Amino acid sequence: MSSTFQLDTSTSRANPTPQPMKRLTVPHIRARKVNGETKEPLVMLTAYTARQAQLLDRHCDLLLVGDSLGQVIYGLPSTVPVTLEMMANHGAAVVRGSYHSVVVIDMPFGSYEASREQAFESAAFLLKQTGAAAVKLEGGEAMAETAAFLLARGIPVMGHVGLTPQAVNTLGGYAARGRSDAEADKIVNDAVALDKAGVFAIVIEGVVEPIAIKATGAVGAPTIGIGASAKCDGQVLVTEDMLGMFERVPRFVKRYEDIASVIDRTVATYAEEVRDRSFPSEDQTYQP
């Protein structure tokens, strides 16, 4: 599909004209898993800005406007302080910058746990403000009824089990889950409960590989791993992590590039040229 996409290469910072490529839908994603198998794994990355979305869109099946933006964009210590307004602002930008991927937006901590009605109000707000296709919420069996409530009212839901960052204060850190029998059973049961509720996909995060594989085989919905297993039905990473924007990243991250070093070298060159007055040159100035 990506071969028909023409990446906008204009110098304008304005949004490019939409390309002749049909946007994927939630049913497309759900249908990728047939009889318990996904022939081509789903590709998902996080996106927080329109330009980032433009660059990622043709390579991905899904773009996740993750509440990880709290740490990545705002420098917050965790995802807990992220607000609905933050998510709405970034979600709208990502939708404007994409034409192919299914855009999923995280429901931030405190926006859906109190009641199913609260969850619906928050999810409806996010979808109306952004144009995103679906919301993602953390939690398994405890959130299954909420997921079903949203689905019955026209809001597609992606689930999230295993290590759930919004519960970091309860979990006591970011250690991998599923090492004990009790944890392993809970992860599988959580995934099954969400699947029965009708979610179209389930993120499995920070889970020991055998349990991630077991959970994937136990559900009809595609699973998307992050620190889980290559045998999940897809994968997701925080884009800035895989690009090498940060010195410290979780063990499960593969750095495909060292963009931080590229930026450092580039800015150092710019600063040097400004200080020695070699920038701007005649090529960058207007003459009479």
Residue locations for each model-derived region?
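Alpha/beta enzyme core
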Residues: S2-P288
